[in-house]
Amino acid sequence: MSARSIGYSKWTEILIRALRSDANLGERLILEITENSAMLVPELVSKFMADMQKKGISFAIDDFGSGVTSFRHLKEFRFDILKIDGQFIRGIETNSDNQVLTQALLSIAEHFGMYAVAESVETEAAAHWLLSVGIDCLQGFISGVQRSIPLGR
């Protein structure tokens, strides 16, 4: 989601109407907010998230590490899922800098009770490395097919 869509009242009305029509929709819905969008209007995003989380919706911060989020915002926003940007994942099996950064982000996700997703997983070697450090979900083009592999907690 973009900051613009969060601030668009018509979209929010449609979402609330859908939630009212299906009591189980909220618990099945995950909305992704890019790191940069969250920072454009943090107060609006924070209020929207709090309101929707009360209705059972989960939120993922997408492309984390690609923008300007301070760690303070991770605490304030209360995202449910942290999606680690692909720039830290590509080549991770041999890039020690990316390994250290990914492990740090995974530790932060664990501390705040967030589900950790590795984006842009493209090789079996990267998948094995990420599994060995405890990532919760792999997302990317493994074996040439885009897919997400939830690993369970």
Stretches found by the model and what they are:
Residues 1-9, 28-42, 55-153:
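EAL-family c-di-GMP phosphodiesterase catalytic domain
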Residues 14-18:
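A short, hydrophobic coiled-coil helix within the histidine kinase transmitter core
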Residues 21-26, 52-55:
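Short helix-capping segments at alpha-helix termini
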Residues 48:
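Conserved functional hotspot residues or short segments at active or partner-binding sites
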